[in-house]
Amino acid sequence: MQPKVPQLRRREGLGEEQEKGARGGEGNARTHGTPDLVQWTRHMEAVKTQFLEQAQRELAELLDRALWEAMQAYPKQDRPLPSAAPDSTSKTQELHPGKRKVFITRKSLIDELMEVQHFRTIYHMFIAGLCVLIISTLAIDFIDEGRLMLEFDLLLFSFGQLPLALMTWVPMFLSTLLVPYQTLWLWARPRAGGAWMLGASLGCVLLAAHAVVLCVLPVHVSVRHELPPASRCVLVFEQVRLLMKSYSFLRETVPGIFCVRGGKGISPPSFSSYLYFLFCPTLIYRETYPRTPSIRWNYVAKNFAQVLGCLLYACFILGRLCVPVFANMSREPFSTRALLLSILHATGPGIFMLLLIFFAFLHCWLNAFAEMLRFGDRMFYRDWWNSTSFSNYYRTWNVVVHDWLYSYVYQDGLWLLGRRARGVAMLGVFLVSAVVHEYIFCFVLGFFYPVMLMLFLVFGGLLNFTMNDRHTGPAWNILMWTFLFMGQGIQVSLYCQEWYARRHCPLPQTTFWGMVTPRSWSCHP
């Protein structure tokens, strides 16, 4: 046993040397910056656990919110109506079952794509294009006139008499703020005796007066004072928006009032919820919406700055690429060759204008108001640029308007005509959308030229039924973009020609047929 002791001590000493060597190696490894694998693994396990807990918590909140919305939308067919008056009309149900818009907290798609460096580079390319337009404008002015100055004549002309347009907006907004809510309050009273009938009749009269104010006042002011296009655009967009919001508020609340049995009254929704609805970026009324915890004012300022940048971009495009081409076109003899060349020339500016309108309004403007009001659901559009069919393009281009058309035109059409009349209901959606789009163009430009009506209703309707969701693949996406390019070129070319033809060939007196007859077909001074 004696000889084994030194051997054991020798092994212990060897073990201590190995341990010291290991510690020394660890120190050297730390000195040279090599990560400790065990500590790195533990750190990654902690990060994974934290991430899974956060994802599970957010998913649970999302499912709870979706379940709550589904319970609110579930038709109470087999349940008796409550004997007591409910606290709000948000818990009443529609007269017929159907899909309802569910609002959840989510970011806009472009905000998500901006987190990717490759997409930010595309955004930077558009900014570089604006810089090139500014530099080219300065260079041309310096060469031709010997001065360096950016003129914003087109922008100043377009927004002329803007204070008058804003003053006209005030009674339009006050009418929308007071009349629908007061009418609902009159209808929600207990139905007993002739007092309720008198109040209901008074509510109908108020709604008729409200419709007259919204429909007649902006048209009268625009025609009488000859407002320029951008000021008219403010009025017509607010006119259509307030009409759609008024209809949505009454459509979502009135059925619950008239479903109450026994002549008992019902509490209308709170006035604050209606006031919030008038400003939040949605056309579907709900008494509550998902809200974000705080307001990012730098995000609001950035979006408004981008709106201003898009306005400048559009003015430079029109001033540099459209005005020089179409200003004197009506002075020349008409030829098919000149018309085709003008349409092809206008495809580039037209698609640029489409992208600028989309980014400025559907992304920047709506996100700015959503952030100021802490409105959580930012899905104002979807990835329409990836569409392989025009049916998908129409659904994803403007989700805000599509939700309104789907809820109150398509679904109500199916309820009135039956589930088999899907084609008729879809045609009704196209007809309403085409007429409103043509009305907006007629209001803004000051003349009737049904280019948008024909493109939207005829060609758009045919493409919607022929290029449907069954077609997939990159070839169909290329075809969709080709039709978009051509459609924008046709619109820009024909509307610009008509605009300058009415300036070069004014009528001796204003008549109805003179307003609705295209002047560019006969104006060749």
UniProtKB/Swiss-Prot annotation:
An acyl-CoA binds at residues 392, 395, 398, 402, 410, 433. Residues 1-119, 188-199, 256-296, 373-420, 468-473 are cytoplasmic. There is a cross-link at residue 280 (Glycyl cysteine thioester (Cys-Gly) (interchain with G-Cter in ubiquitin)). The chain crosses the membrane at residues 120-141, 162-187, 200-223, 232-255, 297-329, 347-372, 421-445, 452-467, 474-505. One of its GO terms (biological process) is very-low-density lipoprotein particle assembly. The active site is at 437. Residues 9-23 have a biased composition (Basic and acidic residues). It is found in: Endoplasmic reticulum membrane. Keywords: Acyltransferase, Cholesterol metabolism, Endoplasmic reticulum, Lipid metabolism, Membrane, Oxidation, Steroid metabolism, Sterol metabolism, Thioester bond, Transferase, Transmembrane, Transmembrane helix, Ubl conjugation. Disruption phenotype: Mice are more susceptible to high-fat diet-induced insulin resistance. May form homo- or heterodimers. Interacts with INSIG1; the interaction is direct and promotes association with AMFR/gp78. Each protomer consists of 9 transmembrane segments, which enclose a cytosolic tunnel and a transmembrane tunnel that converge at the predicted catalytic site: acyl-CoA enters the active site through the cytosolic tunnel, whereas cholesterol enters from the side through the transmembrane tunnel. Catalyzes the formation of fatty acid-cholesterol esters, which are less soluble in membranes than cholesterol. Plays a role in lipoprotein assembly and dietary cholesterol absorption. Utilizes oleoyl-CoA ((9Z)-octadecenoyl-CoA) and linolenoyl-CoA ((9Z,12Z,15Z)-octadecatrienoyl-CoA) as substrates. May provide cholesteryl esters for lipoprotein secretion from hepatocytes and intestinal mucosa. This is Sterol O-acyltransferase 2. The lineage of its organism: Eukaryota, Metazoa, Chordata, Craniata, Vertebrata.
